């Protein structure tokens, strides 16, 4: 269903159509340009800053933002698929692919994807589904449906683009390439073993002639990052995030090789790329089992819960930094890092910034991995007893899960989670959604099926000290200001612009524009809970602001 608002007082429906997406696509070199009229990759550009140079919408006029259109999509393949027919306003032809039988019914979809905008077309996903819609009015141009073999349908975070080709991952672990103009499939390749519990949720990232692909898993299986040829889909290299053979670096931090080979460290969120060093920097997930040292020992369990830099041409690790050595609370460090070139101690430095799920913030030199700043940003974070000699937090054994229970903050959802942070070069602030919930962690398991790769744990939430939109000074790690989120919890990821604006959701379902220097709210509209982050682009001389909630994309402009 599509609703368009050509004037503030006029709404009308668009009839079903089948159209072709127009345009020349995105050349790999174009991904290196500053972010303005398009949004060609997961975070807009390779830096992860989610900062747009657009200024048409700014502090002086943001209150005039008005709904331009909204479009609601329906996943599945109509009567032949597993999830019902297409919605009003949908394309009349649905392209169907996949290796599954076509009759596996899975849960309804939510748009957790970052939406690409190239040549006036928006591209986005749900699990097993991809769409192209007109960026001017939300009309559906094509819809691709993947017949799944099964797997965990927890979400899909979007597409990558290379020339006129798109790439998506599926819950049953295929990398699928589509023609961006028609939605027709070019090829698909297996990227992980479904029988081993893997499921794939990230958006791929295209870097030159590499399609970088991560995966997820919640049982005792090793994490890895892979690179595929964008033309043929052939595997170029594979980097494991845990030691896999005798002599591998980091093996000494595990109880045994067998423990390391089943040690987790999944790669389920896209990273950031520095074209000058050819380093792709990404975060890794928790070790497994997550809540007990029974098999993994008392070491740091490298390279889980870490920032890792890999050379995209060779697939070799350049450096790593553990943000949660020997994690005991499922504090994945998979959050997208942010790359900035900025002053630090009077010198221009190439930096990487991250606010980890564990409640700690870090600034590192992204060329060498040298740790420059470590600071606690969570108001209630209590699981660590201080910093170790490398500047990483040292876990407090007294906060490990016990039979009697341990009161820990943050809970396993973290002080922040996967939703994207942002950075503004105008303010020097790193922005992040901050939650301060408490749980009691019990070393027990009341579910007879077990608890996946968690190692036996029951978690009981016992309240929160509040959720905030927080601004962190990257040079000190200190929180410059906090704005409370209204409603229940946080509100998705973030967007900053040269119009001195910071866009965010809140826990009450509002999309809010803030003063990026102070956090003061300047405008809001209620659209529901934002599932990824707001985005912006310029088209036909007008700046659009878009956000996804549930199965709907909303677009705003100034009238």
Where are the model-predicted features located?
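Short Gly/aromatic-enriched secondary-structure transition segments
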Residues: 52-58, 84-91, 446-448
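N-terminal secretory signal peptides that target proteins for export/translocation
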Residues: 1-4
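Repeat-blade elements of multi-bladed beta-propeller folds
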Residues: 39-43, 105-128, 151-175, 199-222, ...
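Mature N-terminal segment immediately following signal peptide/propeptide cleavage
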Residues: 23-78, 114-117, 139
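Bacterial N-terminal signal peptides
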Residues: 8-18
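Extracytoplasmic/lumenal domain signature
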Residues: 63-74, 130-151, 162, 174-195, ...
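Disordered, low-complexity segments in secreted/periplasmic proteins that are enriched in proline
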Residues: 78-107
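Intrinsically disordered, low-complexity acidic Ser/Thr-rich regulatory segments
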Residues: 96-111, 121, 457-464
């Amino acid at each position: 269903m599509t609703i368009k608002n050509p004037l503030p007082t006029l709404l009308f429906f668009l009839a079903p159509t089948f159209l072709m997406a127009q345009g020349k696509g995105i050349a790999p070199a174009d991904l290196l340009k500053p972010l303005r009229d398009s949004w060609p990759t997961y975070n807009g550009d390779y830096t992860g800053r989610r900062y747009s140079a657009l200024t048409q919408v700014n502090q002086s006029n943001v209150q005039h933002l008005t709904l331009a259109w909204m479009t609601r999509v329906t996943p599945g393949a109509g009567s032949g698929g597993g999830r019902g027919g297409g919605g009003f306003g949908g394309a009349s032809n649905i392209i169907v692919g996949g290796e599954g039988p076509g009759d596996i019914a899975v849960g309804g979809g939510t748009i957790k994807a970052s939406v690409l905008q190239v040549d006036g077309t928006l591209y986005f996903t749900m699990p097993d589904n991809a769409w192209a819609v007109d960026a001017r009015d939300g009309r559906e141009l094509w819809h691709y449906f993947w017949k799944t073999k099964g797997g965990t349908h927890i979400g899909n975070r979007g597409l990558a683009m290379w020339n006129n080709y798109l790439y998506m991952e599926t819950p049953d672990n295929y990398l699928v390439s589509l023609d961006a103009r028609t939605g027709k499939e070019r090829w698909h390749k297996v990227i992980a073993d479904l029988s081993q519990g893997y499921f794939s949720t990230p958006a791929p990232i295209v870097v030159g002639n590499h399609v970088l692909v991560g995966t997820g898993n919640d049982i005792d299986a090793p994490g890895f990052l892979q690179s595929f040829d964008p033309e043929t889909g052939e595997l170029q290299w594979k980097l494991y995030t845990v030691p896999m053979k005798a002599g591998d670096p980091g093996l000494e931090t595990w109880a045994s090789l067998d423990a390391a080979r089943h040690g987790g460290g999944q790669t389920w969120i896209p990273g950031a790329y520095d074209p000058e060093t050819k380093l792709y920097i990404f975060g890794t997930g928790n070790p497994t089992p997550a809540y007990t040292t029974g098999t993994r020992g008392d070491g740091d369990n490298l390279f889980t819960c870490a920032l890792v830099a890999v050379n995209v041409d060779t697939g070799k690790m350049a450096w790593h930094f553990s943000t949660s050595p020997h994690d005991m609370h499922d504090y994945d460090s998979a959050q997208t890092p942010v790359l900035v070139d900025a002053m630090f101690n009077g010198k221009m430095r190439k930096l990487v910034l991250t606010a980890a799920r564990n409640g700690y913030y870090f600034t590192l030199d992204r060329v060498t991995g040298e740790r420059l700043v470590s600071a606690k940003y969570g108001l209630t974070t209590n699981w660590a007893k201080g910093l170790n000699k490398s500047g990483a937090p040292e876990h407090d054994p007294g906060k490990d899960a016990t039979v009697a229970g341990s009161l820990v903050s943050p809970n396993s959802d973290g002080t922040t989670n996967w939703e994207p942070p942002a950075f503004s070069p105008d303010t020097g602030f790193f922005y992040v959604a901050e939650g301060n919930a408490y749980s009691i962690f019990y070393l027990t398991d009341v579910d007879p099926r077990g608890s996946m790769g968690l190692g036996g744990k029951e978690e009981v939430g016992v309240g929160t000290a509040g959720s905030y939109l927080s601004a962190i000074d990257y040079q000190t790690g200190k929180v410059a200001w906090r704005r409370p989120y209204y409603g229940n919890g946080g509100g998705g990821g973030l967007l900053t612009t040269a119009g001195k604006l910071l866009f965010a959701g809140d826990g009450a379902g509002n999309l809010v524009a803030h003063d990026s220097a102070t956090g003061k709210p300047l405008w809001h509209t209620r659209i529901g809970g934002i599932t990824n982050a707001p985005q912006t682009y310029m088209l036909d001389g007008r700046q659009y602001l878009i956000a996804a909630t549930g199965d709907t994309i909303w677009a705003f402009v100034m009238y």
